[in-house]
Swiss-Prot record:
Induction: By stress conditions e.g. heat shock. CDD domains: ASKHA_NBD_HSP70_DnaK-like (cd10234). Acts as a chaperone. Residues 618-631 have a biased composition (Acidic residues). This is Chaperone protein DnaK. Signal peptide: none annotated. The keyword Phosphoprotein applies. The gene is dnaK. Residues 603-631 are annotated as: Disordered.
Length: 631
C-alpha cells in the first residue's frame, strides 16, 4: 500500500512529509533543502523550472516567473484582492474565459490550479524519490480562512498533479496536530499562523488524542509578501527622491528590489541594520545608477506596524467566538516564517500576555501535521480524533437580497443543516437558490459560491410551497447543497462550484497536459543523457585509437572511425533512439579494438592464460565500462 504524504502548499515555500516508523519525517528535495520555493518559471527555450532553480532566474525572467500564486487560487479576476495583486506583480494576471484570475505564460494562459499543480508535482516527486515507490494520495493544507472556492481549487490542483487528495486540512489545525500529538493533559492552545501570503488564528482544545477546534479567524491576503512590498515601496521611494527615477516601471529593477526586500526582512529578525546594495539598478542619460540604502530594524518595524496590528483583530474575534479570554489560553504556538520577526513575537506576547511557544519549526510544522493526518487516514496513527470547523457562515439569498444563514461560522464539520423556505410570488414554477459564504447581512456583500434552480413547483399561492434547503459540509470544508419541493418530492442537488472555477472537462484537459509535459520532460532528460553517454564513448574510443590503433587492421580501424562519425552526427540531432542505435554500433566496433589490445598484452607477457590478470587490465576495463550505460 502506497504511503499517504502530507503537503504544506505554501504561498512562499512548500514542504512535504510522511509518517515513517511512527514519526513524521520532512523529506529533503533534490537540491537538499527541506522546503521548496513555491515558484514556477517558463524559460525562453521552453523549459519549465520549479522551486529554487525557478527562483534563481527570476531577476532575468520576471514576466514568466510566477510566485505567491496561492493568493490568486479560487479568485475571480474582478476580485479586489486579485486586482491588488495584478497591480504589484511583474508577471501578467489576466481574465480567463470563466472569469477567474489566471497568469499569462509564454505559450498560453495558466490557471493558478495548474501552477500550483506543478509545485505539488515537485513535492510528489520528492516523496517518491525518498520512498522509492509511487505516491498517489495526499493530505494538503490550506489556510483556515479559505472559502469553499479556494478549497475546491486546491483539491483540483492536486488532481491535476496526479494526486488523490484524501483530505484538505486547515494549516493551524495541522500545526496543532504536530505540536500536541505527544503532549499529555488537557490544554487550550492558540495557533498564530502568519505565513507568506495568509494569516490564520485558531483556538483548539487538545487532550487524550482529541483535537477540537473551537474557533478560527484570519485574513487570506495578509502575509510576508505584504511585508516585502512595504520594503520595496520604501526603497523605490528613497531612490526616486535621490535620483529622480521611478523604479516601479522597470520590471527587472522591481524584481531585484523584491529579492533584496525579502533578504532585508529576514536579516532584520536577528540584525538591527541591513545595507541594501544594488549596483547598476538602472541607468539614464548620465550613466548607470546604483542603489545603496541602510535599513534599520526600527525603520522596518515602522513600515509594517499596521500589518502587524492587522493580525490582532482576528485574534480578538477568535477569542470572542470561542468564549475565551487571553488568560484562559495555556499556550500560543507560532507558525509561519513571519513569526520569526521580533515585532510579531512581541505583539503576540502583548495580546495573549504570555511568551509564545517557539519549540516547533514554523516552516515545517504544517507539513508534519498533514503527514500525521495522513497517518490517521492510513491507520498508522491510532487514537487521534480531529474536529475542525467551517471558518465562514453559509447560507442563501432570500427575499430582498438578505443573507439567511443555515450554518454559522465555527460549526464543527462535517455537518448537515436543513431549513424550509417558500416562494415569493403566486404560482411561482421555479426557485433559484443562490448560495453565499461570509459574515455580511446582505448576500451580495458575501462571497457568491454558486447557484442552481429547482423547477417544477406545483402552482400555489406565494408562501404555501415548502422548499427544504439542505447544506452539507464534508470534512474538507467543501459544500454541497440540495433543494427539495416537499409537495412534489422533486429534488435538485449540486456540489458547489464557484461561478468561475474549473469544470470537470478543464481539470481532465489539464491532467492530460500535465501527463504530456511529464512525458516531454522525461524525453528531454533521456535525450540529454544519451548525448552525454555518446560524447563519453566517442572521447574514450578516439583516445584508444590514438594509443592502440596500430594493433588493428586498417579495415577495423576504418569501421571504428565510421562508427565514431555516425555517432557524432546522431548526437548533433535530437533523436534519442538514433543516438542509442549509433552508440551500440560504436561499442560493437570498438570491441574489436579491445580484443586486439588484450591479444597484444597476452603476447607481451608470454603467458596466454594469465594475461587477462595483468596490471594494465584495470585501465582497459575502465576505458570500456561504458557497456554498463546501455542498461
Amino acid at each position: 500500500m502506497s504511503k499517504i504524504i502530507g503537503i504544506d502548499l505554501g504561498t512562499t515555500n512548500s514542504c512535504v512529509a510522511v509518517m515513517e516508523g511512527g514519526q513524521a519525517k520532512v523529506i529533503e528535495n533534490a537540491e537538499g533543502a527541506r522546503t521548496t520555493p513555491s515558484v514556477v518559471a517558463f524559460t525562453e527555450n521552453g523549459d519549465r523550472l520549479i522551486g529554487q532553480p525557478a527562483r534563481r532566474q527570476g531577476v532575468t525572467n520576471p514576466d514568466f516567473t510566477f510566485y505567491a500564486i496561492k493568493r490568486l487560487i479560487g479568485r475571480t479576476f474582478d476580485d479586489p484582492t486579485a486586482q491588488k495583486d495584478k497591480a504589484m506583480s511583474p508577471f501578467s494576471i489576466v481574465k480567463a474565459p470563466n472569469g477567474d484570475a489566471w497568469v499569462k505564460g509564454r505559450d498560453k494562459d495558466y490557471s493558478p490550479q495548474e501552477i500550483s499543480a506543478f509545485i505539488l508535482t515537485k513535492m510528489k516527486e520528492t516523496a517518491e524519490a525518498y520512498l522509492g515507490s509511487k505516491v498517489t494520495q495526499a493530505v494538503i493544507t490550506v489556510p483556515a480562512y479559505f472559502n469553499d472556492a479556494q478549497r475546491q481549487a486546491t483539491k483540483d490542483a492536486g488532481r491535476i498533479a496526479g494526486l488523490e487528495v484524501l483530505r484538505i486540512i486547515n494549516e493551524p489545525t495541522a500545526a496543532a496536530l504536530a505540536y500536541g500529538l505527544d503532549k499529555g493533559g488537557n490544554k487550550t492552545i492558540a495557533v498564530y499562523d502568519l505565513g507568506g501570503g495568509t494569516f490564520d488564528v485558531s483556538l483548539l482544545e487538545i487532550g487524550d488524542g482529541v483535537f477540537e477546534v473551537l474557533s478560527t479567524n484570519g485574513d487570506t491576503f495578509l502575509g510576508g509578501e505584504d511585508f516585502d512590498l512595504r520594503v520595496v515601496d520604501f526603497l523605490a521611494s528613497e531612490f526616486k527622491k535621490e535620483q529622480g527615477i521611478d523604479l516601479k516601471g522597470d520590471k527587472l529593477a522591481l524584481q531585484r528590489l523584491k529579492e533584496e526586500a525579502e533578504k532585508a526582512k529576514k536579516e532584520l529578525s536577528s540584525a538591527t541594520q541591513y545595507e541594501v546594495n544594488l549596483p547598476f539598478i538602472t541607468a539614464d542619460a548620465t550613466g548607470p545608477k546604483h542603489l545603496n540604502i541602510k535599513l534599520t530594524r526600527a525603520k522596518f518595524e515602522s513600515l509594517v506596524e499596521d500589518l502587524v496590528k492587522r493580525t490582532i483583530d482576528p485574534c480578538q474575534k477568535a477569542l470572542k467566538d470561542a468564549g475565551k479570554t487571553p488568560a484562559q489560553i495555556d499556550e500560543v504556538v507560532l507558525v509561519g516564517g513571519m513569526t520569526r520577526m521580533p515585532a510579531v513575537q512581541e505583539a503576540v506576547k502583548k495580546f495573549f500576555n504570555r511568551e509564545p511557544h517557539k519549540g516547533v519549526n514554523p516552516d515545517e510544522v504544517v507539513a508534519i501535521g498533514a503527514a500525521i493526518q495522513g497517518g490517521v487516514l492510513q491507520g498508522d496513527v491510532k487514537d487521534v480524533v480531529l474536529l475542525d470547523v467551517t471558518p465562514l457562515s453559509l447560507g442563501i439569498e432570500t427575499l430582498g437580497g438578505i443573507f439567511t444563514r443555515l450554518i454559522e461560522r465555527n460549526t464543527t464539520i462535517p455537518t448537515k443543516k436543513s431549513q424550509v423556505f417558500s416562494t415569493a410570488e403566486d404560482n411561482q414554477p421555479a426557485v433559484t437558490i443562490k448560495v453565499a459564504q461570509g459574515e455580511r447581512e446582505m448576500a451580495s456583500d458575501n462571497k457568491q459560491l454558486g447557484q442552481f434552480n429547482l423547477e417544477g413547483i406545483a402552482p400555489a399561492p406565494r408562501g404555501l410551497p415548502q422548499i427544504e434547503v439542505t447544506f452539507d459540509i464534508d470534512a474538507n470544508g467543501i459544500v454541497s447543497v440540495s433543494a427539495k419541493d416537499k409537495a412534489t418530492g422533486k429534488e435538485q442537488q449540486i456540489t458547489i462550484q464557484a461561478d468561475g472555477g474549473l469544470s470537470e472537462a478543464d481539470i481532465k484537459n489539464m491532467m492530460a497536459d500535465a501527463e504530456s509535459n511529464a512525458s516531454t520532460d522525461k524525453a528531454r532528460r533521456e535525450l540529454v543523457e544519451a548525448k552525454n553517454h555518446a560524447e563519453a564513448l566517442i572521447h574514450q574510443t578516439e583516445k584508444q585509437l590514438i594509443e592502440h590503433g596500430a594493433k588493428v587492421t586498417d579495415a577495423i580501424k576504418g569501421d571504428i572511425e565510421k562508427a565514431i562519425a555516425d555517432l557524432k552526427e546522431a548526437a548533433a540531432g535530437d533523436n534519442a533512439a538514433d543516438i542509442a542505435a549509433k552508440h551500440q554500433a560504436l561499442m560493437n566496433a570498438a570491441m574489436k579494438l579491445g580484443e586486439a589490445i588484450y591479444a597484444a598484452q597476452g603476447a607481451d607477457a608470454g603467458e596466454g592464460e594469465d594475461a587477462p590478470q595483468s596490471g594494465n587490465d584495470d585501465v582497459v576495463d575502465a576505458d570500456f565500462e561504458e557497456v554498463d550505460e546501455r542498461k
